[in-house]
């Protein structure tokens, strides 16, 4: 434990961090068999490099975007403020696109994109979503679109074209609440969503048909449901009467499940549900307030903590998974690290640390290029609390375990 803030935070955690609403459920309803090891492995981060990043030996970094500056000289787009959640998309020429949310309020948010060629040269930069608010995290889809989530109680999820050729689409089917992130099962097109609030639900939208292209989510019929963990990690999904229920009193019905039409529905609530990512039949998501990363196994229909805050990782926020299945989480402040969760014993270990006193910032938007050798992420507000910086780190991530 390396900082006073971490020691204080971890000391305050006395429970598993999941709670039950709408039903009196027994304490033994959750089997916490996935406790993190007390001792974390370490790859011994080196001294800060020229970009003030502490990296594993053999890894290198570069800055690809800075708030207010052009990433590509031939573009009109200047990189946005408050870069947040992100993802990458392959292109037909062997390159890829990295998309990044802008977590700004009052319809000044949106999503920006950087396009790379097959040699990782930046060849374009542009905006794919605009005039939205507090675009926090989101989720990539199997049909190659980006779902960007508005983090405010009247927020929606918007579908965007990473190539910037089609207009953004608001998706009411995915509810109106304090959205954080989304993850899509490619087998069924079911969309899982987190809610960033003190008593937020973990939701899913089950479409009646498989989604194959942009815009189909707008009209498809389906069920909107909330998770309830009922016994030994087993899950049941309960229908939400009105996923578009309006907030009338911020103090009493900020959370979707506390709004009048939805009260009385049993559900398990999570404290500050954050980033989410699909990989290999599982959905991983973080809860920042309780310092945990969760694993929902779709086939087994179980949900349990993969990591509980007793080690290197504190205040997990955005989540991603490497090509080899290593779950990684970015910290909301604390030590400004991206940590991996070991596949051997579920302990956490730092992979990247941002130095140089980024005290008013957080690590956001981790995502790999298609090869799995380049990791993109941002310091949301940089050293001065105003200028976001987006990085690329190159290394043998597939060797980490």
Give residue spans per PLM region:
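N-terminal export signals
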Residues: 2, 8-31
